[in-house]
């Protein structure tokens, strides 16, 4: 059992017969009454986000999530095929499991597949990915003093804001946490 006082971002817990990942939490000590922990949790099966309040010191069950390194092979209609790097066993995941992750997945990419009691519940991407720009407007020379941006579409179909100097064919390093441009690759 884990005390809610020990919550950390990314911790997985089992509450109300569901598996939750702690996205955000805050310890609150009101002037009157007992302390409590306000948390924002993501259901790993459905993807739903819920705010939940726990009394300070309350205990919750930890969820033992198993991470397996796998390589993304290809998309087959609405399913996506991954291969285990150790056993070479292939696993298919529906697009329902891969919501935001589809913006960054490209063939050959290494990911962590998360399972709970044999059931696949999610995919964890690397913190950054390198993707090639397939479409963007040409930048206007000399117009970089203002830090202006333009939109660009990368090879996966994802569209993001980039600096004006980025051109088609450039390789970009993108943060998978928030989808933002970091630098050219």
Curated annotation (Swiss-Prot):
GO biological process: peptide biosynthetic process
A GO MF term: translation elongation factor activity
Organism domain of life: Bacteria
Main localisation: cytoplasm
Biological or metabolic pathway of the protein: Protein biosynthesis; polypeptide chain elongation
Location(s), subcellular: Cytoplasm
UniProt similarity note: Belongs to the elongation factor P family.
The protein's name: Elongation factor P
């Amino acid at each position: 059992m884990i005390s809610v006082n020990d919550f950390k971002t990314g911790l997985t817990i089992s509450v109300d017969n569901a598996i939750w990942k702690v996205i955000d939490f805050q310890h609150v000590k009101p002037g009157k009454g007992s302390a409590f922990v306000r948390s924002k949790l993501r259901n790993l099966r459905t993807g739903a986000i819920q705010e939940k309040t726990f009394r300070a010191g309350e205990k919750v069950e930890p969820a033992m999530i198993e991470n397996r390194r796998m390589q993304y092979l290809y998309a087959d209609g609405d399913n996506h095929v991954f291969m285990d790097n150790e056993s070479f066993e292939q696993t298919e995941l529906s697009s329902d499991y891969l919501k935001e992750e589809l913006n960054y997945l490209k063939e050959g990419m290494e990911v962590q597949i998360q399972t709970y009691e044999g059931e696949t519940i999610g995919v964890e991407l690397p913190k950054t990915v390198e993707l090639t720009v397939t479409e963007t407007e040409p930048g206007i020379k000399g117009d970089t003093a203002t830090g202006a941006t333009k939109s660009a579409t990368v090879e996966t179909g994802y569209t993001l804001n980039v600096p004006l100097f980025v051109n088609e064919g450039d390789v970009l390093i993108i943060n998978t946490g928030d989808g933002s441009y970091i630098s050219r690759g």
